[in-house]
């Protein structure tokens, strides 16, 4: 009897130890994901739920992690606050700080991916900037929200959960920087905000989404176009600032005043958000040609939400010395031109970059 009891106790002890080791192994096998927080509506708070207005960046990264405890089932999570601002205040200084820190984090062997929380107003610009300068093929996912954290039916928690699931998915590797909101995964190069307040505001209008994500379950569609990650030629490792590039919006009866003002105030490049296929008035066209001859790089894009700005189509880019943006909208054309100007002012070389990125 004593022998049977001893054997039974031994079996219980062995099973307990086995389960403990299995749990430890499962915990150790979880992807290690770091959240870099920058503020935005996802960290925003209302004065009351009856009011539409709110203050961005009211909660820090630890608050966001605590608000979605289910993420712990997906990954081993750590968090770091980079800034805590509304994304309308995002600027070159913060971009450089974020990008340099992101590259440091991704270079660590104990980090498998990164989720970045960000305001939605400029999330597409930040995502594309990072897509150009990140030196790793590990997953990087930007998430945000259209409703503040204190709102009824806030969308931030699910967006953060889905972003964590994407970053933890091994299939995310090599897809470049991604943006995930409202159950849709977008490539940084493609995504744009299309509505001022709807949760279904982000769309990839030219090529479509990169995939879908529903309660952490991911369906991938396509690998995004363009060079990125370890294949990118751009680097901000030694950059202290980015060249000034301004966007000029074309319209009926467009004058040259804003073109002149931008150049006078130090712009090294101009992106024309042109009508139709990147066009502008005759006087604006001639002034841009003169500006291009002076060494300021001119990129033609379109103010329309989708379509391509073709080279030498309506405008003779060879004659005027312009760059055609192709698929890139004005904000992303500005980002790529800033990076290009860190390397060269040669228009043909910059056109190559627009062709490839």
Positions of PLM-derived features:
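Bacterial N-terminal signal peptides that target proteins for export
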Residues: 2-13
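Bacterial N-terminal signal peptides
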Residues: 11-22
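ATP/NTP phosphate-donor binding region
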Residues: 26-105, 286, 330
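Accessory alpha-helical/coil subdomains and C-terminal extensions
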Residues: 30-31, 36, 60, 64-71, ...
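Short Gly/Thr/Asp-enriched flexible loops that form oxyanion-binding sites at enzyme active sites
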Residues: 116-138, 280-289
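Short, acidic/small-residue loops that bind anionic groups at enzyme active sites
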Residues: 127-158, 164-168, 293-302
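Internal gly/pro-rich beta-alpha loop/helix module
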Residues: 143-214
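C-terminal non-catalytic interaction/assembly regions of soluble proteins
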Residues: 277-357
